[in-house]
Amino acid sequence: MTSVVVVGTQWGDEGKGKITDFLSADAEVIARYQGGDNAGHTIVIDGKKFKLHLIPSGIFFPQKISVIGNGVVVNPKSLVKELAYLHDEGVTTDNLRISDRAHVILPYHIQLDQLQEDAKGDNKIGTTIKGIGPAYMDKAARVGIRIADLLDKDIFAERLRINLAEKNRLFEKMYDSTPLDFDAIFEEYYAYGQEIKQYVTDTSVILNDALDAGKRVLFEGAQGVMLDIDQGTYPFVTSSNPVAGGVTIGSGVGPSKINKVVGVCKAYTSRVGDGPFPTELFDEVGERIREVGHEYGTTTGRPRRVGWFDSVVMRHSRRVSGITNLSLNSIDVLSGLDTVKICVAYDLDGKRIDYYPASLEQLKRCKPIYEELPGWQEDITGVRSLDELPENARNYVRRVGELVGVRISTFSVGPGREQTNILESVWASI
């Protein structure tokens, strides 16, 4: 029984897809356990970029099983489009498995997402308008439609009719918006269900059988700990639990079967959308990091907010997700800066604190306390070991590990597979 969970430790976009792809080489099953197509991950293989939103990064290994777990909310339209994209690129999807218990995102979820966001005005959350929140709302309200329901023509029609009638009343009476047509949705989405039917199964059985047989299973989280609905910067969060604990609920695997948790972070911090960001940069340094790091959302294309590395955030993520190993990405983006900064604590009303406040009002008053380190000018994209890094870059990597309190297993100096350097094998340490 060998399993590893990969989680983002910041606000998403840390390079989880890259690290999942890297760790997938030694895994036999790769599974997603939460989120939906609001998440985007980019994998670079032989210089070619692949952008995925729903399908796990392990799909590029045809001999390995890729699982979309029950905790994921699935937009069938997006999934069918993503499958076609992979097929056009010559990638087989015969190794994909989709949980019959996963909930379905339908057009009324997306319309409601947009209407709710518009109604918030200046208090908007910055949602991707993918229908994720409303789909999870229906799930919690016990009126959601699952993949198993989508495949049953009569059940799907019955539940869609009930749900759509309720949503249309909401659209017309509360939002003065156009109602949606039952026939159009039913025909389109039932057809999508038939297209994905071959992949649908009880994925909990697949995952538990694999673990019981001693196979290596890799769990891939979406978004990041700071977007977790319980542990993140609420309400500027996603609607699911990206933390490692989400694996047990979102995949149907018990907590006793989790061995290691790899936290993925960048050598700086980024965030898409609204919400607290204590180390955010608004100057030319921030603009430089954004451009060099290509900090634009995979899903939205929106420019990401960027800032210095925040060890307060990282220690919070370590605690609530039980992180055992750290993967540090994008060190190369900081090359060329005379000075690099790391936030080591916050100043809250004149008092030094080293924890991340739950209160948004307190967070607004938090000022980062920085430790400054000398930068490096060298191009490090060709570095293949820690010793090859310039001394100042090496010191930066070590200091990050010290402040977070977790051993760094890998560091990356670029987006390619070959640019991920191993300091300690996660699989071998189990």
From Swiss-Prot:
Binding site for substrate: T298, T299, T300, G301, R302, P303, R304
Textual note on the cofactor: Binds 1 Mg(2+) ion per subunit.
Superkingdom of this protein's organism: Bacteria
List of residues binding IMP: D13, E14, G15, K16, N38, A39, G40, H41, T128, R142, Q223, T238, R302
Enzyme active site: D13, H41
EC top class named in words: ligase
Cofactor: Mg(2+)
SMART domains documented for this protein: Adenylsucc_synt
Catalysis performed (reactions): IMP + L-aspartate + GTP = N(6)-(1,2-dicarboxyethyl)-AMP + GDP + phosphate + 2 H(+)
GO molecular function: adenylosuccinate synthase activity; GTP binding; magnesium ion binding
Binding site for Mg(2+): D13, G40
Pathway(s): Purine metabolism; AMP biosynthesis via de novo pathway; AMP from IMP: step 1/2
Keyword tags: Cytoplasm, GTP-binding, Ligase, Magnesium, Metal-binding, Nucleotide-binding, Purine biosynthesis
Signal peptide: none
Subcellular location, record wording: Cytoplasm
CC per GO annotation: cytoplasm
InterPro entries linked to this entry: Adenylosuccin_syn_GTP-bd, Adenylosuccin_syn_Lys_AS, Adenylosuccinate_synth_dom1, Adenylosuccinate_synth_dom2, Adenylosuccinate_synth_dom3, Adenylosuccinate_synthetase, P-loop_NTPase
Residues that, per the record, bind GTP: 12-18, 40-42, 304, 330-332, 412-414
Family: Belongs to the adenylosuccinate synthetase family.
Complex formation: Homodimer.
HAMAP family: Adenylosucc_synth
Function statement: Plays an important role in the de novo pathway of purine nucleotide biosynthesis. Catalyzes the first committed step in the biosynthesis of AMP from IMP.
Record protein name field: Adenylosuccinate synthetase
Source organism (scientific name): Streptococcus pyogenes serotype M2 (strain MGAS10270)
Protein encoded by which gene: purA
